[in-house]
Every structure is written in C-alpha cells, then in structure tokens.
Amino acid sequence: MGNKVNPIGMRLQVNRTWDSRWYADTKDYGDLLLEDLAIRDFIKKECHQAGVARVIIERPHKKCRVTIHTARPGVIIGKKGADIEGLRQKIAKMTASELHLNIVEVRKPELDAALVGESIAQQLERRVSFRRAMKRAVQNAMRMGALGIRVNVAGRLGGAEIARTEWYREGRVPLHTLRADIDYAHVEAATAYGIIGIKTWIFKGEIMEHDPAARDRKAQELQDGPAPRGAGGRR
C-alpha cells in the first residue's frame, strides 16, 4: 500500500500538515478551493524562474495569507521590492480577502523533492542525458544530508521510439513507515519527443512526535544543520 499511494497524503496529520489551512462553510468551500487553485497556478507560472517549492495558503478571519517557499527569493522580491509588490497586486485581484504575501527561503534545495524534480526536468529539456541528471540529483541530495532518495523517470527517454521507465535509488526510502519524513513530488518535462514524467522521493529521517507541525520543525532542523547523534530520532 505504501508503495502505491502518495507519501504526503498518507502522512497527513502524522508528520505533515496541509498546504491549504482554512475552514469554510459549505456554500463558500467550492469558491475558496477554486481560488486556491488559481492562486497556486498563477504563482508557479509567474515565478517559474524562482524555484517555487511550496505555496501555503491560510485564511484567518477575512484575510488570505500566502506563503511562498522558494530557493531564490531575490528573483521574486526584485530590486528594492518592486517585483514582489507587483506580484502582490496581481494576486490581490484574484481574491476578495485582504492579502498578506510572505516569502520563505529554502536553504537546501537539494533536499526538496519539488526542486530536485524541477532541476531534472530543466536538464532533460536541455537534452542532458537522463542518467547523468538523475545521478547528479541523487549525489547532491545524499551529500546534503538525505538518508535516502529515489528518482523515477518515464517516457521516451533519449528519444526512444518506445516509452519506458528508469529509476535510481540510494540509501533508504521506507514508504511503509508512517513516522518517516518523506518528501515527494511529481514534475513533467516537456521535451522535443514528448512529456517525460519525473517522480522524486527524499527520506530525511524519522519524526517521533505526532504533531501536524512536526514536519516543518524537522525541515527547519535540516536547514540549520545536522543534529548531534542521540539528540532525537534515528539519523
């Protein structure tokens, strides 16, 4: 079962929480959900050069708080904050609530599944060998402290006539262990021969406490540096 389902959805409320954090009545739920999807699609399209990893949307009373996790915050902020102000005005037109826009830097993009997948996709679109791109991503993740990583690519690899799937794994990726902190992402690369799907799993360690915010705390620990042995769960 753990090998088939989405690792993030399987671990919601165990060691990870939702990216949309709000409650709405039945009559408003559909409109707010469509608004969330529109905001996410717009941000990923508008800021595709900034390496957007996650977009978290919270809705306290009559407000909309959007937090963008990015590997290159300077690209979004721009010179003297000009670009982020323009982005804020565009997003504000998509919602009737008061908008608050926050930018959070991803200090270790090599440990973020979405950013690793985007990097591989960009290399494939530049005609880099898929084996070289996969191996480079795996080596960088392990060098930065990941305990395990798996990368799958599927499609007309290298321009082959018949589509196939190739994968590369290093370390442990325990998909059946609920306390395992596993980041997952699916990205598509638009090559001259067609679409190539890229799936990335990154195992960062085990989270022992059952708290929706535990995953965010663990991610912050990884960004700040490795903890000494014996200071928490298994390393």
UniProtKB/Swiss-Prot annotation:
Gene3D superfamilies xref list: 3.30.300.20, Ribosomal protein S3, C-terminal domain
SMART domains (alphabetical): KH
Keywords: Ribonucleoprotein, Ribosomal protein, RNA-binding, rRNA-binding
Record PROSITE patterns: KH_TYPE_2, RIBOSOMAL_S3
Origin superkingdom: Bacteria
Region: Disordered, residue numbers: 213-235
Function: Binds the lower part of the 30S subunit head. Binds mRNA in the 70S ribosome, positioning it for translation.
Protein family: Belongs to the universal ribosomal protein uS3 family.
Assembly description: Part of the 30S ribosomal subunit. Forms a tight complex with proteins S10 and S14.
The protein, known as: Small ribosomal subunit protein uS3
Natural source organism: Roseobacter denitrificans (strain ATCC 33942 / OCh 114) (Erythrobacter sp. (strain OCh 114))
